[in-house]
From Swiss-Prot:
CDD domains: Radical_SAM. Binds 2 [4Fe-4S] clusters per subunit. One cluster is coordinated with 3 cysteines and an exchangeable S-adenosyl-L-methionine. The keyword Nucleotide-binding does not apply. [4Fe-4S] cluster 1 binds at residues 68, 73, 79, 308. Its main location: cytoplasm. This is Lipoyl synthase. It catalyses: [[Fe-S] cluster scaffold protein carrying a second [4Fe-4S](2+) cluster] + N(6)-octanoyl-L-lysyl-[protein] + 2 oxidized [2Fe-2S]-[ferredoxin] + 2 S-adenosyl-L-methionine + 4 H(+) = [[Fe-S] cluster scaffold protein] + N(6)-[(R)-dihydrolipoyl]-L-lysyl-[protein] + 4 Fe(3+) + 2 hydrogen sulfide + 2 5'-deoxyadenosine + 2 L-methionine + 2 reduced [2Fe-2S]-[ferredoxin].
Length: 321
């Protein structure tokens, strides 16, 4: 049996090429077998606007990336028009192959040492008051990218002293304590790490990740920074039950997580995991009530909710659906 061809740095693998070597194979969906989107998910998206064009141009001119574009987020137009964006640092190539995610897989390029300064200047030019900084998984880096996160936070605050910063971090697999030591030098205003789904679905949805590791990351950060809110997000529609999701919410609270986002999974292409169920808005409302009953201070639950969707409003405690 021949070895698989070695990936070249900077080459993006998507769709079938991306998911070809995951433990639970994804069978490409046929159109006639795909669930029809219900009316509550039919959102009319504007093709463009001056604000959308301005933000895209600012990103392009500085060589920056937004997860809004790279992950094909359905809320891109709304968020860009609102003047918010979630910046994706450390490149646009992930070392993982999660079959729910539309971000490309491959061998990433070396981190751009100038990215923290370019990011800070772009945020200043855009006059943003609240930003979310996330990244691809960088298993190729000894610290998982933690130092780059800290550098970005420091540079952003130097140019934007009044800004609030939320970080949506990867799991720093195998290097949690080292990563947290680094992040302690520049802690964010909100610390976010997504569990994504219930543990029994990790093998098919999050190959390479571990449910308990992710919970431990959130708990250990909170122990070090008790005044910084911790946050996590989940998708629904991957085959989980509401009872399984309720147990995940209990696990999050047991690990001192205070903020929650819960939204509907949408299949990016026929090569990604299929949607097994569209969850009605009423069920999201029921889970929001349950989350608040067990102690979450903020719970944004609804079909179109994403981890960074109106993150500024979530942080203010305003209701987001």
């Amino acid at each position: 049996m021949s070895r698989p061809e070695r990936l070249q740095p900077g080459v993006k693998l998507r769709d079938a090429d991306k998911v070809s070597r995951i433990p639970v194979k994804v069978v490409p969906s046929e159109r006639e077998t795909m669930l029809r989107k219900p009316d509550w998910l039919r959102v009319k998206l504007p093709s463009s606007s001056q604000r959308i064009d301005e933000i895209k141009q600012a990103l392009r001119s500085n060589g920056l990336h937004s997860v809004c574009e790279e992950a094909s987020c359905p809320n891109l137009a709304e968020c860009f028009n609102h003047g918010t964006a979630t910046f994706m640092i450390l490149g646009a190539i992930c070392t993982r192959r999660c079959p729910f995610c539309d971000v490309a897989h491959g061998r990433p390029l070396k981190p751009d040492a100038q990215e923290p300064k370019k990011l800070a200047q772009t945020i200043k030019d855009m006059k943003l008051k609240y930003v979310v900084i996330t990244s691809v998984d960088r298993d190729d880096l000894r610290d998982g990218g933690a130092q780059h996160f800290a550098d970005c936070i420091r540079e952003i605050r130097l140019l934007n002293p009044e800004i609030k910063i939320e970080t949506l971090v990867p799991d720093f697999r195998g290097r949690i304590d080292a990563a947290l030591d680094i992040l302690a030098t520049e802690p964010p205003d909100v610390f976010n790490h997504n569990l994504e789904t219930a543990p029994m679905h990790y093998r098919k949805a999050r190959p390479g990740a571990n449910y308990q590791w992710s919970l431990d990351l959130l708990k250990k950060f909170k122990e070090r920074h008790p005044d910084v809110p911790t946050k996590s997000g989940l998708m629904m529609g991957l085959g989980e039950t509401n009872e399984e999701i309720a147990q995940v919410l209990k696990d999050l609270r047991a690990h001192n997580v205070e903020m929650l986002t819960l939204g509907q999974y949408l299949q990016p292409s026929k090569f990604h995991l299929p949607v097994e169920r569209y969850v009605p808005p009423a069920e999201f409302d029921e889970l929001r009530v349950f989350a608040e009953e067990i102690g979450f201070t903020h719970a944004a639950c609804g079909p179109m909710v994403r981890s960074s969707y109106h993150a500024d409003l979530q942080a203010q405690g305003k209701e987001v659906k």
